[in-house]
Amino acid sequence: MKKIKDKKNSLGDGIYLKNNKWSFSGDASKNFDKHIIRSVPLYLEGHKMIEDLSRYTLSKKSLCYDIGCSTGTLLNKLAKINKNARFIGIDKEKDMIKIANTKKKFKNISYICNDIMKYRMKKSDLIISYYTAQFMNPKLRQSFFDKVYNSLNWGGMFILFEKVRGSDARFQDIYNNLYYNFKRSQGFTNFEIVNKEKSLVGVMNPFTENANNDFLKRAGFVDIEYIMKEICFSGLVSIK
């Protein structure tokens, strides 16, 4: 089905509906960085937080995974300040991996196009899921967290940033209104906001903060701390 590039199909930033569903390929990959910065509150601040946290867990010959690495922006930042560590970015979208490779600035970064649930991870000291798990099939979510826990070395760190649901309908309504106001403040039109919400139905499946905590605890994590929160977007750190 051919995309029609007009206002009715626009999601903003040169990205258009593709078969009425959000996709990370094509226009989305080419314009991803600009779009995500305008779409997610404190997106770049989250990157800075991860840079700072990486200093506590990465050392010489440490391995770090970025699951759902998209265009590789975060790994370039991490590799710059952790020159003796190794970084592997994993993303199942080949268009994202292609862009990440063209943007790669450091030799200690490598990119792999694969589904994380099919990829055999090595023992590592840091695993990052930056707004990635929310796009996984809910049936696989617990298996994903189990895999992360089992792949970490003792004392290793898992950094998880997610869009989250409100704990009840009242809080969800508040989240929605505050988030839509944020997107309008970033220049998105009402058409684009509604189109994006429709495109994510069945594609993105966020859980509540409590549910994410439960996933982590069932996987084996005990030490869990929230490090960032803005509207319905939160970041936490778990240490094995």
Positions of PLM-derived features:
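C-terminal alpha-helical "lid/dimerization" subdomain adjacent to the S-adenosyl-L-methionine
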Residues: 163-218
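Conserved beta-strand signature within the Rossmann-like core of class I S-adenosyl-L-methionine
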Residues: 155-163
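A conserved beta-strand element that flanks and buttresses the S-adenosyl-L-methionine
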Residues: 128
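Conserved alpha-helix/loop element of class I SAM-dependent methyltransferases that forms part
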Residues: 42-60
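Class I SAM-dependent methyltransferase SAM/SAH-binding core
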Residues: 65, 72-118
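A short glycine-rich, Lys/Arg-flanked "PGG" loop and its adjoining helix->strand segment in the class I
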Residues: 142-154
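N-terminal, positively charged/glycine-rich alpha-helical extensions of SAM-dependent methyltransferases
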Residues: 1-31
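Core SAM-dependent methyltransferase catalytic element
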Residues: 222-240
